[in-house]
Amino acid sequence: MHHDLKHRIQAMRVKLEGRAPVAEIQGSSQLFVTPSPECRRLVELADVRETDRILEPSAGTGAILQAIRDAVPRAKCDAVELHAGLARHLQAHFPEVRIWCGDFLEYHPERRYTRIIMNPPFNRGDDIRHIRRALTLLEPGGILTGICLDGPRQQKALESLAD
């Protein structure tokens, strides 16, 4: 029995070593990688076009940025990422995207965006704070698509914002 467990662990180790990690992330409990189908759906709902100025305010590993790139390769994107290691990863893998490393709530771009696509942090109501902040950066007539919790607090806070 002990030998079998040791063998299975070794087999898993070999599989893991054969993969390149998306990024080395240390101690970030607020990082939730958005699965590809959800990313594609967010981009589809945003109706992204080449002429749009797009913001991804919690870029993480770049899953949403990749979906944007796949859908509209020439789209102009900016991204914000709090974690310095992830910001470096994003800059290396998305050189065409302007990356700002810092707290999105303190981000002050020169211009507003026509599209904002996001999966904000959910801890202690951060999703609502990030969505409200994102709306202040959206051009009139712009589109924001995002993921947030679906609890009573979120429903109440976002009810007046949805159309």
How should each PLM-predicted stretch be described?
Residues 1-163:
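Class I S-adenosyl-L-methionine-dependent methyltransferase catalytic core
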